[in-house]
C-alpha cells in the first residue's frame, strides 16, 4: 500500500492496552484500536491516556490505525 492512501485524523487516547496498543477516540466520535509507529517506539516517546495524537487509518480497515504523532 502506498503512503498516500492513508487517512490522517486526530484523536485522544482513552485507554492503554497490552502490547503497545491504545484505544483512541477520534474527533468524529469513532473509537479505533491503534498501535505505535516505529519512530515513536524508537525514540521512547510515552503515550498516556488523555494525550492528543495523530492517527493514520487505512482505507481498507477503519477500525485499526497507527499513532504517528503525540502533541505536547
UniProtKB/Swiss-Prot annotation:
The modification Phosphotyrosine is found at residue 60. GO terms for cellular component: cytosol. Component of the 30S ribosomal translation pre-initiation complex which assembles on the 30S ribosome in the order IF-2 and IF-3, IF-1 and N-formylmethionyl-tRNA(fMet); mRNA recruitment can occur at any time during PIC assembly. The keyword Cytoplasm applies. One of the essential components for the initiation of protein synthesis. Stabilizes the binding of IF-2 and IF-3 on the 30S subunit to which N-formylmethionyl-tRNA(fMet) subsequently binds. Helps modulate mRNA selection, yielding the 30S pre-initiation complex (PIC). Upon addition of the 50S ribosomal subunit IF-1, IF-2 and IF-3 are released leaving the mature 70S translation initiation complex. Disulfide bonds: none annotated. Pfam families: eIF-1a. Keywords: Cytoplasm, Initiation factor, Phosphoprotein, Protein biosynthesis, RNA-binding, rRNA-binding. Gene3D superfamilies: Nucleic acid-binding proteins. Belongs to the IF-1 family. It is found in: Cytoplasm. It comes from Oceanobacillus iheyensis (strain DSM 14371 / CIP 107618 / JCM 11309 / KCTC 3954 / HTE831). InterPro entries: NA-bd_OB-fold (IPR012340), RNA-binding_domain_S1_IF1 (IPR006196), S1_domain (IPR003029), TIF_IF1 (IPR004368). This is Translation initiation factor IF-1. One of its GO terms (molecular function) is rRNA binding. Residues 1-72 form the S1-like domain.
Amino acid at each position: 500500500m502506498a503512503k498516500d492512501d492513508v487517512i490522517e485524523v486526530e484523536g485522544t487516547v482513552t485507554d492503554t492496552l497490552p502490547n503497545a496498543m491504545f484505544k483512541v477516540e477520534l474527533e468524529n466520535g469513532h473509537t479505533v484500536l491503534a498501535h505505535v509507529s516505529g519512530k515513536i517506539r524508537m525514540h521512547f516517546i510515552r503515550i498516556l491516556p488523555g494525550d492528543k495524537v495523530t492517527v493514520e487509518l487505512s482505507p481498507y480497515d477503519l477500525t485499526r490505525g497507527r499513532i504517528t504523532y503525540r502533541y505536547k
